C-alpha cells in the first residue's frame, strides 16, 4: 500500500517547537536574517502561495503581496498555533498533510516557499517533485536548505573531529530526520524537476553562540544582509536560500472555492465531494476531515 512506501515524517505534533526554539531559544538573529532573505527573493505579489512546512506561521506575515496563502504542515498542533497567530479568514487556508503525498491538484500555485523544512526530508528529490507538480509553469519557488559544505563542517573535517565529508554529494543525517545537503546536489535535483535557479543567498554567516551573546541581533543581521549576495560566488554558510522559477509560462486561474484546490492524496481523484465537515473521494471513497478550520489529509477518517 502507498502508506507503507512513504518515507518517515518528522512530526511536531504536541511540540513546543515555536516557543522553545524560536521565541526563547536565542534565535532572533537567524529569524531576522531569514526575513531579510525572503524580502529579497519574493516576487512583488501573486494569487496563491503554498507555504510548505509552515509550522506555527512564523514566516507567513512576510508574504504580504499574495492574495491567499495555504499553510501546509504535518502537525495539526503547529497549524493551530498558526491559526491563533493569523486568525481565520479567506486569506489563509490551513492544511495538515504529508509533503510526500500532497492533496493539491496539479498546477495550482503561482509561488511556493519551503523554509527549514527540506532538512527533515529523507527523500528530498521526491519532496521537490511534489512541489513541482503543485506549481504553475513560471511559478516562483523559494527554497532554504541546510548546507553540508559550510565552513564549520569543513574545519571540523580537516581537524579530524568529524567523520563525514562535507565535500561528497550525498546528504548527511547528523541526527534522526535532520539532514544537511550539498549545494551541487540541490541544484541538480532542482534542474531535474525543471526549475531554473535565478538567485542564491548565503544566510546566517555569524551563527556562532559567542557572537550572538555579545553582539545585538539587529547589528549582526545587518552585517549578514551585506554578505548574503556572496551566495552568487560560493556557498559556505549553514543556511542557503534559493530563488528558482519553474520553466514555462502561464498564469492559470485559481478557483474561488477552496474545495477545488484538492485531490485525493491516496488515488489522485478530483474534484472531491464537499460534505460540510468532510471531503469525500468519489473514486476510492476515502473521507478526509475538516475540523476547526483545518483540512486534515494525513489519514482517512475512521
What are these regions (language model features)?
Residues 1-55, 78, 142-165, 298-302:
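Conserved class I S-adenosyl-L-methionine
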Residues 54-101:
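Class I SAM-dependent methyltransferase SAM/SAH-binding core
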Residues 113:
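A conserved beta-strand element that flanks and buttresses the S-adenosyl-L-methionine
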Residues 125-140:
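A short glycine-rich, Lys/Arg-flanked "PGG" loop and its adjoining helix->strand segment in the class I
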Residues 160-163, 188, 199-270, 275:
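A C-terminal cap/extension of S-adenosyl-L-methionine-dependent methyltransferases
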Residues 164-185:
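Acceptor-substrate binding/catalytic loop of class I
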Amino acid at each position: 500500500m502507498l502508506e507503507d512506501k512513504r518515507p518517515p515524517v518528522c512530526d511536531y505534533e504536541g511540540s513546543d517547537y515555536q516557543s522553545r526554539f524560536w521565541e526563547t531559544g536565542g534565535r532572533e538573529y537567524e529569524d531576522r536574517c531569514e526575513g531579510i532573505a525572503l524580502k529579497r527573493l519574493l516576487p512583488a505579489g501573486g494569487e496563491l502561495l503554498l507555504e510548505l512546512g509552515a509550522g506555527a506561521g512564523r514566516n507567513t506575515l512576510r508574504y504580504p503581496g499574495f492574495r491567499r496563502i495555504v499553510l501546509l504542515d504535518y502537525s495539526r498542533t503547529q497549524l493551530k498555533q498558526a491559526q491563533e497567530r493569523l486568525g481565520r479568514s479567506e486569506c489563509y487556508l490551513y492544511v495538515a498533510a504529508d509533503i510526500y503525498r500532497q492533496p493539491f491538484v496539479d498546477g495550482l500555485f503561482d509561488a511556493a516557499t519551503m523554509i527549514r523544512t527540506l532538512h527533515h526530508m529523507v527523500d528530498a528529490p521526491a519532496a521537490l517533485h511534489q512541489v513541482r507538480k503543485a506549481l504553475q509553469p513560471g511559478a516562483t519557488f523559494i527554497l532554504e536548505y541546510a548546507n553540508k559544505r559550510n565552513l564549520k563542517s569543513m574545519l571540523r573535517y580537516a581537524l579530524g573531529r568529524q567523520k563525514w565529508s562535507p565535500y561528497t554529494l550525498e546528504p548527511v543525517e547528523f541526527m534522526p530526520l535532520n539532514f544537511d545537503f550539498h549545494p551541487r546536489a540541490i541544484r541538480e535535483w532542482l534542474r531535474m524537476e525543471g526549475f531554473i535557479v535565478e538567485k542564491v543567498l548565503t544566510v546566517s554567516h555569524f551563527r556562532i553562540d559567542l557572537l550572538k551573546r555579545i553582539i545585538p541581533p539587529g547589528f549582526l543581521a545587518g552585517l549578514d544582509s551585506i554578505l548574503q549576495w556572496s551566495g552568487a560566488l560560493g556557498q559556505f554558510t549553514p543556511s542557503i536560500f534559493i530563488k528558482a522559477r519553474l520553466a514555462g509560462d502561464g498564469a492559470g486561474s485559481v478557483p474561488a472555492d477552496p474545495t477545488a484546490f484538492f485531490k485525493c492524496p491516496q488515488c489522485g481523484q478530483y474534484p472531491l465531494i464537499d460534505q460540510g465537515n468532510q471531503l469525500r473521494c468519489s473514486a476510492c471513497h476515502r473521507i478526509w476531515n475538516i475540523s476547526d478550520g483545518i483540512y486534515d489529509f494525513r489519514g482517512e477518517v475512521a
